[in-house]
Amino acid sequence: MSGTHRVDADTLEPAHISARKGRLMDNRGAATVEALIAKGVEIPNPSTVDITDDVNPDLISAEGVVIHPGCRIRGSRTVISSGSILGAETPMTIENCRLGRDVELKGGFAQDAVFLDGASMGSGAHVRSGCLLEEQANGAHTVGLKQTILFPFVTLGSLINFCDAMLTGGTSRSDHSEVGSSYIHFNFTPDGDKTTASLFGDVPRGVLLDQPPIFLGGQGGAVGPVMTGFGTVVGAGAVLRADVPDDGMLVLPEAPAGVNRPVETASYRKLAAVLAKNITYLGNLSALESWYRQVRRLFLTRLEYGDAILAGALDCLASARAERIKRLGRLIEKVRPDTPERQELVDNRAEFLAALTVADGPAPAHVIRKFGAASGDGVEYLDAIATLNDEERHDVTAWLSAIVAEQHRTAAQTIPALSAQF
C-alpha cells in the first residue's frame, strides 16, 4: 500500500528507521561514545562524534566533560580531565593531546600538545606538536602554534602565527603577557633554516609568576631568534628584529633601510649570535624540565590523570629540544668553513650537538620541602607559588639560572669561541 513502511518485528519501528539507526551505531567509535555517555560525559549529538579505536575511555573524565557535535578524538595518549569542553564554537579535533581540568578548545585542530588547567583556544585553532600551554594560557580565534610554550595567563589575540617561541611574564589573569592580533613570529629564513626560536622573558624568573608582563603589539611581528626582558612593550605595527635585553623597555623599532643588492646565500653573518641564542633557549628548556621534574611533579601527580599529563609536558619539552638540535645540525651542514671559528664549528659538529643534551641540577631542599607540604595540604600549584618568600624566590632563580649557565658551559667546551657570547 502506497505510503506505508514495513515494521521491524524486534523494535516495532519502521524498518527504514531501524536500519538507519543500525548504520549510525556502526560509526567508528560508537561503542566508545556509548561508554562515555554511560559514565557521565555529555555528548549532545553522539552520532556526529568520531573517536578512533585507540582512544582509552578510562582517560576521559566523567565529571563535567562536554564533547560537542562534529568533534574528532584520536590517539592512545589522549587525556581529557574534568570540566573540559570540546567544540563549543566549531568542531574540534584532538590527537594525542593531554588536557588538564577545565580546558576549553572551542574549535580547530590540536596534536601532541598539552593544555594545563584552564587553558583555552578559540575556534580556528591550529596547535601542533611540542606545544605546552600552562594554566589559563589562552588564544582567541584562528591562532597557529607549533613548538610553542606559553606560561600561565599568557593571552594571544586573533589571527596569530606564533611558532617556535617561549613566552613568559605576568602574575595573574588581570596582569598577563599578551600578543596582539595579527602578530607573526617569523621563524623561517630565506636559506631554509629554522634556528629561530625566540625567548620572551626567561624560565629562572618566569616560573615565579612575579615578573612584569610582556606586550607584543598587534599587526606586528618578531624575526627570530630574538630575546627580550620582562616588561618589554613593543608597539603595534612594529617588527622586532633585535634583542631587548633590559627589562621594562618600550620599543618602537625603525623600519630597516632599503636594500637592492645580489643575494648572498648561507652567509650567516650573525652565526655566533644565532648559535648562542639557540643554546640559551635550550638552557631555558633544561631549566623548565628540571622545574617540572622536581616541582611541578608534586602537584600534577596527585590529580586525576596527573601522571599522564606530567609525562605529556615532559614529552613536549623533549620534542622542543630535539627540534632545536635538529635545526642547528642542519644549519651547521651549510656553514662554509672560511674562517678558523667556522672551521672549528664544522669539524666539531657532532661533539657540539651532543653537548646540547639536558642540563640539570638539584632544587633547593627547603623549597622542595615547602612545595611538598603545600601539595600534601591540597594547595593548588598557582597558589603555592604565591607563598614563596623573597629568599625562596632568590634561591629558585639561582638554581634555574645555574642550569642555563651549565648549558652554556658545556656547549662552549666544544666551541670555545662561543664563550664570548654568554
Placement of each model-derived feature along the sequence:
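Domain-scale signature associated with acetyltransferase and cell-envelope carbohydrate enzymes
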Residues: 1-213, 219-221, 230, 243-248, ...
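Cys/His-rich Zn2+-coordinating "finger/knuckle" modules used by eukaryotic regulatory proteins
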Residues: 235
